[in-house]
């Protein structure tokens, strides 16, 4: 599962895109790891035995993920069709002898209706727990399916967008986390015997995540910023008693309790990186966990509570799987993405520096900066700059591996990766500063960043915008509302009009997005004022657009309408559409077509010689 080619320049984006990535999905009671591996072009299931032996389990037509079924040699596979996100759940028996990995024909449908979503939430002995919008296409229910009989039981049908669900130890109750009417807020309820009891206030502007039952079923454990700026770890009883276990005045915390309830793995979010520590069940600190790099981790406990499987990505770690010994706090590499990289490539990858940039209104904008190894600014020559803008908006830029960013740096560009207002990871106040009619303040942050780029050797007259999803919207907003400021833009699956986006996105998505951007029936005029397409006559910089034809979040029409308008005005715009993709590019063959073209577009417009 590896390829080696010596002395490849960092600017070779194709080689960077071909570095295979690992991610962990589950671990069973024998220590076998169910992993995702994209060496074949899309993420497929691979089993890593306790002795390190690798077995390829699937070779589906598109990406997939999965979990082990408890006490069985089988997995439940989650898969969709060409990125449409209508996920289906199938069973794959591992004791059946096959010639090679399984295709779709080898899967036994467990939950199947291609018109709707079935999102895998959890596995319990004999059961799979999932959420689905099949009842009306809008509201999500929580359902269990008996793995032996196929019988399905609806545990929650109270409406709304269900973000997560946790089945109680008795199996009679389910704790449901739904998005509430407030932006970036959730409500937690307990559903039992057809009734729903609130645990948190639906009117509270607070985010509650990672809800898990205590092993004895007497309460819940969660991460929450209820009446707080940053999320802490709290134990909540059904009678409304809250007991804070771990708190921080500077960082959001997440919690992953061990299956036996004895230990808590606490994740601290620290300026785009995650720090780990083990605490006891009352929140007392036991030990810190040493990681091989400052990056971002995913977490899955072993059933015996003695180990944790971690996925790690960092600027110089494309995607590794680690095994954490809870008794020592030591995390050892199980499989490494670097084994599939050309010789010397990992050593050339660039670490970012961290900065705070003053905004026009006195706020400060956190950002990372990736600078070329041979910095021309040291000799008094300012270089081209790309702003890489994250999606969401209720997300954050993090310290992770991005092959396109690394290739930009290798081509001689400085890359600024900001967390403008509205980003998570820096407290409730910061992520609330772009809500509703504050949207234009977030766009104004782009100009503050542009004025600042000379501080890191950048030329403010040679800055391009690059972003996906909400980041793509920011690209279009900057190019149309601040047309004097930008040399070029790359928009990936971005919204060109908040009005047509809300009108055409699926109903379940509209309810989710209106709480952030504004409601069509009462705020249409403001939504028009915040839409890039309203100012299209001001656009002067060339634009490069990438979109998946099956995008269920931001419809392809958002890119098609801006392409048509620019063509009609005789302005430069290239649109690449991929018929087998959705909200982003999941297939390596498509990434190899789109991203080198986007990089060539940028280095040409920013006056940087195209790498040989």
Q: Language-model segments: which ranges?
A:
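Cap/lid segment of the alpha/beta-hydrolase catalytic domain
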Residues: 337-462, 466-469, 474-477, 502-511
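Active-site-proximal cap/loop segments of hydrolase catalytic domains
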Residues: 420-612
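Conserved beta-propeller blade repeats
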Residues: 18-34, 61-79, 89, 111-131, ...
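Hydrophobic/aromatic anchor residues within beta-strands of the central parallel beta-sheet
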Residues: 142, 233, 367, 415, ...
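Beta-propeller blade-edge and WD-like acidic-aromatic loop motif
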Residues: 2-9, 39-56, 80-107, 127-154, ...
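An edge-strand/N-cap motif at the start of beta-rich repeat modules
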Residues: 1-15, 25-35
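Hydrophobic/aromatic beta-strand patches that form the interior of the parallel beta-sheet core
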Residues: 188, 355, 387, 416, ...
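Flexible loop/turn segments at secondary-structure boundaries
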Residues: 42-43, 183-184, 206, 229-231, ...
């Amino acid at each position: 599962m590896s390829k080696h080619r010596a002395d490849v320049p960092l600017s070779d984006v194709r080689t960077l895109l071909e570095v295979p990535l690992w991610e962990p999905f589950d671990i069973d009671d024998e220590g076998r790891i169910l992993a995702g591996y994209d060496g074949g072009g899309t993420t497929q299931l691979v089993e890593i035995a306790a002795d390190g032996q690798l077995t390829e389990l699937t070779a589906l037509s598109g990406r997939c993920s999965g979990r082990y079924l408890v006490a069985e040699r089988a997995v439940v596979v989650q898969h969709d069709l060409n990125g449409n996100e209508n996920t289906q759940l199938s069973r794959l028996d591992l004791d059946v002898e096959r010639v090679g990995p399984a295709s779709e024909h080898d899967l036994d449908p467990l939950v199947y209706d291609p018109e709707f979503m079935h999102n895998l939430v959890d596995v319990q002995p004999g059961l799979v727990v999932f959420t689905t919008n099949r009842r009306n296409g809008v509201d999500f229910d929580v359902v269990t399916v008996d793995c032996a009989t196929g019988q399905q039981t609806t545990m929650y049908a109270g409406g709304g967008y269900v973000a997560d669900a946790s089945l109680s130890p008795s199996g009679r109750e389910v704790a449901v986390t739904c998005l509430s009417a407030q932006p970036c807020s959730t409500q937690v309820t307990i559903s039992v015997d057809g009734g729903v009891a609130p645990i948190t206030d639906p009117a509270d502007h607070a985010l509650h995540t990672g809800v898990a039952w205590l092993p004895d079923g007497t309460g819940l454990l969660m991460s929450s910023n209820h009446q707080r700026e940053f999320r802490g770890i709290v134990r909540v009883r059904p009678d409304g008693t809250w007991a804070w276990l771990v708190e921080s005045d500077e960082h959001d915390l997440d919690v992953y309790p061990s299956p036996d309830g004895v230990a808590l793995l606490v994740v601290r979010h620290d300026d785009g990186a995650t720090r780990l520590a083990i605490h006891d069940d009352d929140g007392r600190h036991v030990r810190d966990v040493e990681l091989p790099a400052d990056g971002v981790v995913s977490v899955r406990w072993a059933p015996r509570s003695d180990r944790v499987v971690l996925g790690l990505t960092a600027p110089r770690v494309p995607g590794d799987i680690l095994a954490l010994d809870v008794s020592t706090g030591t995390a050892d590499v199980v499989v490494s993405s670097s084994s599939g990289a050309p010789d010397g490539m990992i050593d050339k990858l660039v670490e970012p520096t961290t900065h705070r940039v003053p905004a026009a209104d006195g706020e400060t904008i956190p950002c990372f900066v990736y600078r070329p190894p041979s910095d021309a600014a040291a000799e008094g020559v300012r270089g081209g700059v790309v702003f890489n803008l994250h999606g969401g908006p209720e997300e954050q830029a993090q310290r992770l591996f991005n092959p396109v960013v690394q290739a930009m740096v290798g081509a001689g560009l400085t890359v600024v990766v900001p967390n403008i207002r509205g980003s998570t990871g820096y407290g409730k106040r910061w992520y609330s500063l772009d809500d509703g009619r504050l949207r234009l303040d977030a766009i104004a942050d782009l100009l503050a960043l542009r004025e600042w780029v000379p501080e890191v050797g950048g030329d403010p007259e040679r800055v391009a915008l690059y972003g996906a999803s909400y980041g793509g919207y920011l690209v279009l907003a900057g190019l149309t509302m601040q047309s004097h400021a930008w040399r070029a833009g790359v928009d990936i699956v971005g919204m060109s009009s908040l009005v047509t986006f809300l009108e055409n996105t699926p109903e379940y998505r509209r309810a989710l997005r209106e709480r952030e951007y504004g409601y069509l029936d009462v705020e249409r005029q403001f939504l028009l004022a915040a839409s890039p397409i309203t100012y299209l006559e001001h656009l002067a910089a060339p634009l490069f657009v990438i979109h998946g034809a099956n995008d269920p979040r931001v419809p392809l029409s958002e890119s098609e309408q801006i392409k048509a308008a620019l063509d009609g005005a005789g302005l430069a715009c290239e649109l690449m559409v991929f018929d087998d993709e959705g909200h982003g590019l999941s297939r390596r063959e498509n990434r190899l077509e789109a991203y080198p073209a986007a990089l060539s577009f940028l280095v040409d417009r920013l006056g940087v010689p195209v790498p040989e």
